[in-house]
Each structure stands twice: as structure tokens, then as C-alpha cells.
Amino acid sequence: MPVGVPKVPYRLPGDVQVQWIDLYNRLYRERILFLGQTVNYEIANQIIGLMLYLNGDDKSKDMYLYINSPGGAVVPGIAIYDTMQFVEPEIRTICMGVAASMGSFILTGGEITKRIALPHARVMIHQPSSSYYKDQAGELIMEAEEVLKLRDCITKVYVQRTGKPISVISEDMERDVFMSAKEAKEYGIVDLVALDVDSNS
């Protein structure tokens, strides 16, 4: 039987009475967001909406985006990334579990110096793939051209955000490249490994 979303106590400023609200609403009040599933239009629109609301609420306070995602659709992922660059508050990205494919792309979009991986997190990068299956040859050609444009866009972002040469990024995106938290730091996808007992990272 599903448990549902847990409720936690919360007291509004100035109120004596404690009210119970769902966990996610409580975390949103602390500017904490989650990407804990496959990236699609629905979750992208939810995260974008929250970022825009929090941007309007207070432009000076950082937001925290926790990522545990196997990746997903490219266009919604790019929309999240672009919104992260658009809003005024700095976005701290934290990888827990896995940030693969578009998950790693969003992870690298956090404010540089404020991108974190937990010690046992995994990161994976690769090239975008087509999510459409068309019958007509002309549509297949158009789809292939669009995938190449998206790949070029993603490659340029990784180059800009990691400091790696375009030749390295292009070669690595030819296959699935998995990294530990420490390797992701060395690669430039994250800046810190949190709670690292093996080093002072």
C-alpha cells in the first residue's frame, strides 16, 4: 500500500498554531528542490515553475537542486538548464545517487563553485539520442539534423562549464562515460565532494 507524501509540522512566522504540511511544500519553503526521476516535460515544468516563483520571492537567496536522476528527454532538460541560468539566485546542485545523461547536464549547470556530489554518487555523460521513431525518410533526416544540433549545444555547455577541451568532451560523449564523485570533480562537472572521508575535498 502506498504511503503517500509524508507530512511535517510547520509554523508560519508569527503564528502560535503548528500546521502539518506535506514534506515537499516544507522543503520548497527552504528553497530546496528535487529532481528524483526521469526528466520529462511534466517534471521540468514543475521545477521551472518553482524556480521562477522562488526567483520572484527572493532574488538574493540561493536555491538547492538535489539530483538523483537517470536522465531523460533532452529538450525539457535543456529548459531546466536555461532557467537555472536565467533566474537571479544562484543554484546549488547536489548529486546524490546518480546523475546520468540529462541529469549530469543539469548538475553541471549549477553555480560554479557550488556544484556538489555526495561521496558515493555516480555521474554519467553521453550524447543525446533520438526519442522519436518516424516512418518517412525525410522526417528521419530532419530528426537526425535536430539530434546533431542538440549534441552540439550540449557539447558546448559541457566545454564551458567543465573547462575541458571540446575534443575531450566530443570523444567522451561518443559512449557512456561513468564517473565516481571524485572523478566527476576532476572532470569539472562538480566542484566539491561532500563528506569525503578520504580527502579534504
Swiss-Prot record:
Signal peptide (UniProt feature, chain positions): none
One GO term (biological process): protein quality control for misfolded or incompletely synthesized proteins
Cellular localisation: Plastid, Chloroplast stroma
Main location: plastid
GO CC, any one term: chloroplast stroma
A molecular function GO annotation: serine-type endopeptidase activity
CDD domains attached to this UniProt entry: S14_ClpP_2
EC number(s) per entry: 3.4.21.92
Catalytic activity: Hydrolysis of proteins to small peptides in the presence of ATP and magnesium. alpha-casein is the usual test substrate. In the absence of ATP, only oligopeptides shorter than five residues are hydrolyzed (such as succinyl-Leu-Tyr-|-NHMec, and Leu-Tyr-Leu-|-Tyr-Trp, in which cleavage of the -Tyr-|-Leu- and -Tyr-|-Trp bonds also occurs)
A matching Pfam family: CLP_protease
Active-site residue numbers: S101, H126
Keywords (A to Z) from UniProt: Chloroplast, Hydrolase, Plastid, Protease, Serine protease
Disulfide bridge positions per record: none
Cited InterPro entries: ClpP, ClpP/crotonase-like_dom_sf, ClpP/TepA, ClpP_His_AS, ClpP_Ser_AS
Domain of life: Eukaryota
Enzyme class name: hydrolase
Keyword Transferase: no
Protein family (similarity comment): Belongs to the peptidase S14 family.
Subunit structure: Component of the chloroplastic Clp protease core complex.
Function text: Cleaves peptides in various proteins in a process that requires ATP hydrolysis. Has a chymotrypsin-like activity. Plays a major role in the degradation of misfolded proteins.
Protein known as: ATP-dependent Clp protease proteolytic subunit
